[in-house]
């Protein structure tokens, strides 16, 4: 399912009514996607969106709790539910599911993820499962392949989606698991890709407005 721009526009419109300025945050792995959606909102509404990106979503939510001003959050629903934070989110809009994507470096002739267990792939990477939803999805996918499909010496865990993508683009690893946005942004720099829709828990994206923080309700002075 494609990410629903209309749903994000609705969330940003609500935020623009509740706050003086729309300020958007997300984790590093979703930054490019969030930028695309914010651009669509600005084109539709004429309102500017301030972008607050940098760390993983846990770090960004901690910044909101400390008063950095972000009032709209984009992330996957599972990660947001797992975070321990005083930030309460309201006006939640579904953006749809987004897939795990297997990519490989230029010059490597692969059919797709089915070649992962062959000698064609000497080493591959995926994001740290403790820090990134795509890392957890990749781990689930690999676990479902069976214990003997991929040897441990092939696997490299890297902090985030952008870093995994960079390793593949530079040829430091043969392949990696990332997201659709990273794949599209680097389509001219990689050898190929395959979207995976099974073998892991669905990654459901949402946009939500910061509704309650330290006793202050959105829209109330």
Name every feature range the model reports, one short phrase each.
Residues 21-46, 50-221:
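Exported/periplasmic ABC-transporter solute-binding proteins
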């Amino acid at each position: 399912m494609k990410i629903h721009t209309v749903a994000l526009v609705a969330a940003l419109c609500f935020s623009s009514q509740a706050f003086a300025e729309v300020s958007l945050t997300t984790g590093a792995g979703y930054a490019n996607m969030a930028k695309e959606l914010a651009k669509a909102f600005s084109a539709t509404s004429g309102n500017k969106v301030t972008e607050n990106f940098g760390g993983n979503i846990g770090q960004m939510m901690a910044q909101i709790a400390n008063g950095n001003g972000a009032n709209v959050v984009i992330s996957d629903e599972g990660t947001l539910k797992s975070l321990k934070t005083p930030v309460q989110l309201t006006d939640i809009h579904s953006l749809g599911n987004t897939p795990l994507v297997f990519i490989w470096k230029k010059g490597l002739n692969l059919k797709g993820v089915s070649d992962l267990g062959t000698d064609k792939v000497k080493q591959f990477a995926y994001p740290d499962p403790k820090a990134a939803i795509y890392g957890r999805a990749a781990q689930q996918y690999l676990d479902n392949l069976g214990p003997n499909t991929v040897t441990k010496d092939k696997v490299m865990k890297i902090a985030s989606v952008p870093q995994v993508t960079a390793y593949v683009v530079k040829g430091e690893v043969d392949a990696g698991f990332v997201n659709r946005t990273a794949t599209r942004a680097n389509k001219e720099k990689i050898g190929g890709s395959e979207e995976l829709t099974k073998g892991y828990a669905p990654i459901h994206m949402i946009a939500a407005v910061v509704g309650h923080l330290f006793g202050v309700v959105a829209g109330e002075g």
